[in-house]
C-alpha cells in the first residue's frame, strides 16, 4: 500500500512538472498595448454621431470629447494623435465589438454600471464625464417637470441604461406612458421630430446635442429633472489589466494636468519646471512610464496633443462649443465639482 502511494505521488509530481515546463515554453499572449504598438495605430470605438462627443464632418474628420480622449491615448503611445482609427458603433454594438476585439478601447458616452463590469467582463477606466438622464419636450406640451409626463409617448434608445431608468422612474412615480424604443439614437430623434412621440429621453449632455439637430431648436425644451447618475468613461476588456491601467492613467493625466496648470500651449515651460509634481508629470523624475509599458514622456505628450481636461471640455462641450454646457459636477473637486484624479507618484 505504501509503495503504491509513493508511486502515485511520484507520477503526479512528474505530470505537474511536465505541464509546468510546457506552459513555460508557450509564447505569452501579446497584451493590447503591444498589439497596438505593432499595428501602429489605436482602434477606438466611438458613437455614430453625437455633437460634442463624436461626430464626423463632410471631409471625414472626427471631432468631439470622446474622440479627443482617443487621440490623447494615441499621443501617449506614439507621440502622434493621428495614429488612431475611429470605429462608429451603435449602443447595441458597442460592448460586443469591444469584447470581440474589434476595437482596443471604447470611448463612446457609455455609463459605468455594476452589471456591465461583472456580467460583460468589461472594465471602466474611470469617469470622464458625470452625466444624468433627462427629458426633452416640445414647448407645445407645456410640462415643466418630468412628473407632469403622464399619458405621454416617450422615445428612447433600446438596449441602454436610459431605457431601464425611464421605466424605474415613471413606475415609481405612478406615471402612465407609452414607450417607443428604437434601435439607434438617430431613429429615436427622428420619431421625436416627426411627432411620433412627444418626449425624448437621453443623457442630458446628449439632449443638448440632439436639440441642435432639430429644424427649430428653440421649439424644444430640456426639463430640469435629472433622474439618474450616468458616470461616462472609457471602457476596456477586463482580461488585460495592464492596458486598463494605461487607459485609466491617461484619463487621470488630463485631470492632473489641469490641476497643475499644464496646458497644450505651455508644455515647454512645464518641461523646464523645477516643481517636483510637474517634473514627475513630464517624466523628468520617476519611472512611471516604464510601469505602464511606455516611456516617461507619455503624459506630457497627451496634453500637448489635445490639452488638459478643461481644454477638452470647453472646446467640445462647454462655453467655447455649440452646446454651452456648464461644467457643474465636472468641475475640479477644488472648484466645487467632483472631478478628482489620484496623484502621479
Regions found by a protein language model. Give the residues of each.
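Bilobed "Venus flytrap"/periplasmic-binding protein-like clamshell domains
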Residues: 43-52, 62-77, 111, 131-183, ...
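C-terminal functional modules
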Residues: 288-345
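Acidic, polar ligand-binding/catalytic clefts
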Residues: 71, 75, 79-148, 204-227, ...
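Bacterial N-terminal signal peptides that target proteins for export
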Residues: 2-16
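Extracytoplasmic small-molecule ligand-binding "clamshell" domains
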Residues: 30, 34-109, 292, 297, ...
Amino acid at each position: 500500500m505504501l509503495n503504491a502511494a509513493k508511486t502515485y505521488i511520484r507520477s503526479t509530481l512528474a505530470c505537474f512538472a511536465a505541464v509546468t515546463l510546457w506552459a513555460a515554453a508557450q509564447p505569452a499572449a501579446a497584451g493590447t498595448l503591444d498589439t497596438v504598438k505593432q499595428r501602429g495605430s489605436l482602434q477606438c470605438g466611438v458613437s455614430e454621431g453625437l455633437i460634442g462627443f463624436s461626430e464626423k464632418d463632410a471631409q471625414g474628420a472626427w471631432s468631439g470629447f470622446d474622440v479627443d480622449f482617443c487621440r490623447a491615448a494615441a499621443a501617449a503611445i506614439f507621440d502622434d494623435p493621428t495614429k488612431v482609427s475611429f470605429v462608429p458603433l451603435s449602443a447595441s454594438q458597442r460592448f460586443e465589438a469591444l469584447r470581440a476585439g474589434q476595437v482596443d478601447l471604447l470611448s463612446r458616452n457609455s455609463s459605468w454600471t455594476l452589471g456591465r463590469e461583472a456580467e460583460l467582463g468589461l472594465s471602466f477606466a474611470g469617469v470622464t464625464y458625470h452625466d444624468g438622464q433627462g427629458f426633452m419636450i416640445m414647448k407645445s406640451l407645456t410640462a415643466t417637470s418630468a412628473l407632469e409626463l403622464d399619458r405621454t409617448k416617450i422615445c428612447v434608445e433600446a438596449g441602454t441604461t436610459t431605457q431601464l431608468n425611464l421605466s424605474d422612474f415613471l413606475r415609481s412615480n405612478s406615471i402612465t406612458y407609452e414607450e417607443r424604443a428604437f434601435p439607434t439614437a438617430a431613429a429615436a430623434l427622428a420619431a421625436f421630430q416627426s411627432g411620433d412621440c412627444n418626449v425624448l429621453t437621453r443623457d442630458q449632455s446628449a439632449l443638448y446635442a440632439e436639440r441642435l439637430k432639430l429644424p427649430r431648436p428653440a421649439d424644444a425644451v430640456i426639463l430640469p429633472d435629472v433622474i439618474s447618475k450616468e458616470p461616462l468613461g472609457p471602457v476596456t476588456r477586463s482580461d488585460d489589466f495592464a492596458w486598463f491601467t494605461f487607459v485609466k492613467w491617461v484619463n487621470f493625466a488630463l485631470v492632473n494636468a489641469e490641476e497643475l496648470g499644464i496646458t497644450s500651449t505651455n508644455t515647454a515651460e512645464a518641461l523646464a519646471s523645477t516643481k517636483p509634481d510637474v517634473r514627475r508629470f513630464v517624466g523628468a523624475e520617476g519611472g512611471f512610464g516604464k510601469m505602464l509599458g511606455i516611456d516617461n514622456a507619455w503624459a506630457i505628450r497627451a496634453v500637448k496633443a489635445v490639452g488638459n481636461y478643461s481644454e477638452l471640455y470647453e472646446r467640445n462641450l462647454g462655453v467655447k462649443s455649440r452646446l454651452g454646457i456648464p461644467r457643474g459636477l465636472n468641475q475640479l473637486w477644488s472648484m466645487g465639482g467632483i472631478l478628482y484624479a489620484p496623484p502621479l507618484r
